[in-house]
Amino acid sequence: MKKLPSRVFLVLLFTLLLAFSLHGQLDPGGELQYLQGSDGAIYFYAQVQGIIPVYLWVDFPQLQNLEPSSPFPQGWVIPPTLSEQEELQSSLLSLLPEAPPEDLEIPPDGLILFSLRPKANSSTRFQIQFRYTYGIPMDPRSHDHLYLFPFPHGTKFQVTQGFNGSFTHFGENQYALDFDLGVGDPIHAARSGRVIGVKEDSNRGGASSSFASYGNYILVYHDDGSFGNYVHLRQNGALVEVGDWVEAGQLLGYSGNTGQASGPHLHFDVRVPTSDGQFKSIPVRFVSLYGEIIDPEVGKSYYAVHPGGQPFVPVFGDDIRDEDFAGYLEAVPRGDSLEIRTEVVDSTTLVFLQNTYNQAYWVEISLSLTNLLSTQGSRIIREVPAQTEVFLTLLRPANPERGWSHRIQYRFRPLP
């Protein structure tokens, strides 16, 4: 930076406001520099290299005895290619009150954005804040794309935290979704786009917000300017690289438990840049198994259906009824015990009782339930034939957003 004239006393205070997500760093890493020209004005220029447009937001919380060439706060969309930047530069220079001095040593990739011109015989002072983000600011209400569920075709996973979730889904993550994928489960692209961010070096995770920056992620830029954000991947769990084009349904990587997470899962959201250089998640809808539009709900499980996928037979826990087991009697090997057997389909638990004795028994079953409802009540009495399994009840959560548990006790006596 060239020296300022002796008549000017200038205090420079820079603040870089990073576009930081709870679930990953989304800052494209641009620079904002300045030089003083021989005309006394201070010229600010950007240096950005990328594969998609970048938005730079600038404000001056303090500006004393300096005349800006543009009103503030102000934002600029900086295109990724040098040819496009040169075209933008021509229009920006036309907005300056005077052309920059010819001896101003701006780097070849520097894009002059604005200037500050000191007022005569005055001490000057300014504080500047700026923020780079990917993409072009847009109206978050203008998106109506239907997404694929981000897991393999024919598989089903549950929404464990939805829009406005109390654990982490607020602020810019207001419209995020958590799916109960386990460590190593495949993640697939919910929509086609260009990969513009990958982090996969972390092996740290936990429920505290102190782990937020450790979340591995893949960030995909869509053709309408929105971004698909896939978070909590396992270490070295990304199969794509920055610059790759991915198709909807394509395998991206593997789920994990990194970053701020109380357990393994996939965090997915769609976000758009805002005019103040930040990000805002937007509500998303998905294509259902039967081609209908789905607004995802906490506690419900959904099948992924991808174009070209093989037909499969779906099974939903919510569709199971006691009537499906009317007259159910299943032979079991001979043994010396009464045993409870359970099956879990989505958030529905099917409860069976096996009598492996070579004798029929009268059995009274008592259920101790936490946040669960039994379709047969908490006390069930059954006569169970020898070496036979019988159906007892269905258990479903009263509130899918809370945890649930059950304890089953029974007493029995042989039938004459």
Which stretches of residues belong to each language-model region?
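Bacterial N-terminal signal peptides
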Residues: 10-19
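Intrinsically disordered, low-complexity Pro/Gly/Ser/Thr-rich segments with frequent PxxP/GP/PP motifs
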Residues: 67-121, 372-401
